[in-house]
């Protein structure tokens, strides 16, 4: 299915079902969000590049308007919905619009062993980073997005995950990524603990 979608380029990767708070202050995006609110339509969140945007993005629906400021600025919360691929960009408005094609995952499920490993590693990373523990829904068909969206991972890696059309591939990629970053995290925590204990690193 294809559609014409207004785009909001950001230095972020939005996943399906992920919540994202936004502060809208630029006139062109105040106009865009105003139209989306009036028409109850989604917009596309795409990762901004130097002179362009990423080819793969995620549509976003406005879930809540937290505050409308007197100068027209907005504080909103959006939720990721469907992934899309940009087919062409339209520059007729003050903000970008794009012809997009939505896509879903290919059939297939995660291996239970990959899920168990990913959830265990994720919990350790959250603990090392001092984050709040949460219980992921291991029956979620796109569990990889839930796990990746809860951590401040490398944006290039998140962008790669967003474009993969296999949940199994994403989960395997997550396990490999978690295993790669954990040694440095463990060392960093030990250094901090040692410094806090005796005043020396």
Describe these PLM feature segments.
Residues 1-201:
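N-terminal low-complexity, acidic/polar interaction/targeting segments
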């Amino acid at each position: 299915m294809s559609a014409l979608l207004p785009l909001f380029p950001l230095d972020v990767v939005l996943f399906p079902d992920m919540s994202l708070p936004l502060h809208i202050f630029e006139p062109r995006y105040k106009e865009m969000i105003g139209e989306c609110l009036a028409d109850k339509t989604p917009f596309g969140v795409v990762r901004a590049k130097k002179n362009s945007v990423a080819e793969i993005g995620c549509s976003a629906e406005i879930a809540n308007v937290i505050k409308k400021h007197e100068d027209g600025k907005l504080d909103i919360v959006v939720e990721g919905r469907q992934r899309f691929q940009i087919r062409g960009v339209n520059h007729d408005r003050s903000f970008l619009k794009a012809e997009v094609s939505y896509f879903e995952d290919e059939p297939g499920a995660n291996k239970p062993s990959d899920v168990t490993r990913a959830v265990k590693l994720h919990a350790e990373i959250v603990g090392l980073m001092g984050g709040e523990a949460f219980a992921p829904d291991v029956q979620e068909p796109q569990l990889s997005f839930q796990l990746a969206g809860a951590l401040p991972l490398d944006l290039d890696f998140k962008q790669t995950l967003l474009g993969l059309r296999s949940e199994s591939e994403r989960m395997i990629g997550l396990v490999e990524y978690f295993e790669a970053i954990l040694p440095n995290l463990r060392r960093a925590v030990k250094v901090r603990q040692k410094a806090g204990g005796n005043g020396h690193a």
